[in-house]
């Protein structure tokens, strides 16, 4: 390639991690001779994750005594490489369980995981319990995101009848 030609290659923010070969061909306007050069480009890995409830779900849910409720948690791989995320729950008193404690997600994609919160007979109407969910990247353990949820035992409404004599 002749002197004086500058070629700039820039990866977009959603470029997928990896090595790429770029072939550049050009010819002078006064010649039919084609010149070619190959360039290599490396897109560095970027790990990123975010957690959210699906479809605008509320971070405060409700449950009955000795029952369970579920939350649909969306795990977003905001990074540019396939990644596996470890999901943990902490700070809670009630039983809290993910259907999958690890999820593998393609770059710039997401997966929904069901979180189940279970109460027993020891809770009372109006009680609540908070939990902090954390998703941690296995590609880079320093990358994580958290989401806080609160579950309340539904207050029992009804009528009470008593007789008077």
Regions found by a protein language model. Give the residues of each.
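Long beta-sheet-rich domains in secretory-pathway and surface-associated proteins
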Residues: 1-165
């Amino acid at each position: 390639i002749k002197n004086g030609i500058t070629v700039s290659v820039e990866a977009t923010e959603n470029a997928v991690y990896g090595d790429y070969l770029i072939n550049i061909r050009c010819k002078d306007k006064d010649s039919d001779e084609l010149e070619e050069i190959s360039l290599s480009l490396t897109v560095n890995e970027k790990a990123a994750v975010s957690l959210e409830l699906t479809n605008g779900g509320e971070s405060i849910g409700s449950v009955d005594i000795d029952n369970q409720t579920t939350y649909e948690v969306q795990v977003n791989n905001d990074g540019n490489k396939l990644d596996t995320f470890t999901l943990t729950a902490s700070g809670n008193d009630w039983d809290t369980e993910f259907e999958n404690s690890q999820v593998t997600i393609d770059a710039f994609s997401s997966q929904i995981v069901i979180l189940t919160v279970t109460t027993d007979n020891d809770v009372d109407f109006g009680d609540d319990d908070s939990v902090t969910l954390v998703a941690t990247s296995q590609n880079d353990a320093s990358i994580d995101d958290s989401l806080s949820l609160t579950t309340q035992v539904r207050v029992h409404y009804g009528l009470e009848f008593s007789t008077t004599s």
